[in-house]
Regions:
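Beta-propeller blade termini and top-face loops
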Residues: 1-48, 55-67
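Short beta-strand edge segments in extracellular beta-sheet folds
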Residues: 140-146
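Disordered, low-complexity segments in secreted/periplasmic proteins that are enriched in proline
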Residues: 45-55, 104-118, 146
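Short acidic/polar inter-strand loop motif in beta-rich domains
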Residues: 11, 104-108, 131-139
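Beta-strand signatures of extracellular beta-sandwich domains
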Residues: 71-75
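Glycine-centered tight-turn motifs at strand-turn-strand junctions
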Residues: 81-119
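Surface-exposed coil/turn segments at beta-strand junctions on protein surfaces, enriched
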Residues: 53, 65, 89-91, 119-123
Length: 146
């Protein structure tokens, strides 16, 4: 669901309101709430060769009732840290974006490293761990191939 505003000229703005629609009075009254994540899709062929490089990022949405100390980590099925996402700690609705890559994961490409590509994770189950003032909230992400 999108809210779209446009002018008769060239301007247009589209806002994805799906997460906003999930903000209930119970969510607003909570210290923190972690919504179901958007899985994303890895490129066919891992971003190498004929499969192409198109992929969809994964998104983690969360609500904070008040300003808080926040961290957001992606873990693999074994509980090992895969990536740490930038996470805002101000009160309100937040979205964090994961490029489906491993932390520090740019791989060199042809051209002396000029063309860099992400070190994509493999398809499978991952866990987003949101820590708010020392309390953990978890949701599952399952990125697959395009």
């Amino acid at each position: 669901d999108f809210l779209i505003a446009a002018t008769h000229g060239r301007g247009m703005f589209a806002l994805d309101v799906r997460q906003l629609q999930k903000v209930t009075p119970t969510v607003v009254a909570s210290v923190a709430h972690l919504f179901d994540a958007e899985n994303g899709a890895l490129p066919a062929g891992g971003g190498r060769g004929r499969g192409g490089f198109n992929y969809e990022r994964a998104y983690v949405h969360y609500w904070l009732g008040d300003d808080a100390a926040v961290t957001l980590e992606i873990q693999d099925a074994q509980g090992s840290m895969v990536n740490v996402l930038e996470a805002g700690g101000s009160a309100g609705l937040h979205q964090a974006e994961w490029a489906l890559d491993r932390l520090g994961g740019n791989q060199g490409g042809r051209g002396g490293g000029f063309f860099r590509r992400p070190n994509f994770v493999e398809p499978g189950d991952y866990t987003a761990v949101l820590t708010v003032n020392g309390v953990e909230y978890r949701t599952t992400l399952t990125p697959g191939r395009r």
